[in-house]
Swiss-Prot record:
One of its GO terms (molecular function) is 3-oxoacyl-[acyl-carrier-protein] synthase activity. CDD domains: KAS_III. The gene is fabH. Pathway: Lipid metabolism; fatty acid biosynthesis. It comes from Vesicomyosocius okutanii subsp. Calyptogena okutanii (strain HA). The lineage of its organism: Bacteria, Pseudomonadati, Pseudomonadota, Gammaproteobacteria, Candidatus Pseudothioglobaceae. It is found in: Cytoplasm. This is Beta-ketoacyl-[acyl-carrier-protein] synthase III.
Length: 314
């Protein structure tokens, strides 16, 4: 039985079509300056013909390549997504076939907290000796459910995918995880229509989401550090859900962590929901900021609301 679940490979993928803030200003009442000041986002990526599985496949293959394992060594695949390619089967099973795996595969839907929930689930499989190698992917094509005429949401969301490969370890890995949900705030952030029968778009009460996100994530970050006896100055990096620079900055300030210890990539891809944490992680691993042995705090909140944190020694 492994004591820890350790990340041994990361990967990410963004579709080639880029929508800049200036592009958006041609169709809705906004400006680059307005968007950057309120969100920190400069551009987002948008699929043309690619599916959620297509993005996931590319990110997964890059993570598997870094991990240096054969796809047949995978014991489980968990795909976190809000934008599944079909009502059924699970997009994870389509991904399984696409990459040539033969293990069980399932989807997990917890919106922007999806990767946190999926990674925690994978950790439990490994610690219970039900799996040793697990592929966890966050992949989204949110452009399919964005109303591009709604300034409050069109400026925020983008498409992309990120992936990690987890392996059992006796030495280091995930040290702590905590998950929460509270369904009392359903109307604050949702796709209102029944998408099985109707076309629905993301609807959001921005001010309420901001307040709840900052409060919940700050409290959870403080709780995580306290329960693991880790001072914030011993934390090497925060890798947050890339939702909004104001939320990210407010949480960092509450736990007395300077922004130069926070991985921020949302300016290049916007809010990619379940893909955002693994996207940011892969970027920082590949550019050398995150190194083996670093203590990382993942934290994110999504509609529902559902939120969670993971402390990991990379």
């Amino acid at each position: 039985m492994s004591k820890f679940a350790r990340i041994i490979g990361t990967g990410s993928y963004l579709p080639p079509t880029v929508i800049t803030n200036d592009d958006l200003s041609k169709t809705i009442n906004t400006t680059n300056e307005w968007i950057v000041a309120r969100t920190g986002i400069k551009q987002r990526h948008k699929v043309t013909n690619e599916t959620t599985c297509d993005l996931a496949e590319k990110a997964a293959n890059r993570a598997l390549e870094m991990a240096g394992i054969n796809v047949k060594d995978l014991d489980l695949i968990i795909l976190a997504t809000t934008t599944a390619d079909k009502i059924f089967p699970a997009t994870a099973t389509i991904l399984q076939t696409a990459i040539g795996a033969s293990c069980p595969a399932f989807d997990l839907q917890s919106v922007c907290a999806g990767f946190i929930f999926a990674l925690t689930t994978a950790e439990q499989y490994i610690k219970a000796s039900a799996a040793n190698k697990v592929l966890v992917v966050g992949s989204e094509t949110l452009s399919r459910i964005v109303n591009w005429n709604d300034r409050s949401t069109a400026v925020l969301f983008g498409d992309g995918a990120g992936a990690v490969v987890l392996s059992g370890s006796d030495n280091t890995g995930i040290l702590y995880s905590k998950l929460f949900s509270d369904g009392n705030y359903l109307s604050s952030l949702q796709v209102s229509n029944n998408y099985i029968n109707e076309v629905g778009f993301i609807e959001m009460s921005g001010n309420e989401v901001f307040k709840i996100a900052v409060n919940r994530l700050s409290s959870l970050a403080e709780k995580t550090l306290k329960e693991t006896n880790l001072n914030s100055n011993k934390l090497d990096w925060i890798v947050p859900h890339q939702a909004n620079i104001r939320i990210i900055s407010a949480v960092a300030k509450r736990i007395k962590t300077p922004m130069n210890k926070v991985i921020v990539t949302l300016e290049n891809h916007g809010n990619t929901s379940a893909a955002s944490i693994p996207l940011a992680l892969d970027t920082a691993v590949r550019d050398g900021r995150i190194k083996r042995g670093d203590h990382l705090l993942f934290e994110g909140i999504g509609a529902g609301f559902s939120w969670g944190s993971i402390l990991i020694q990379f």
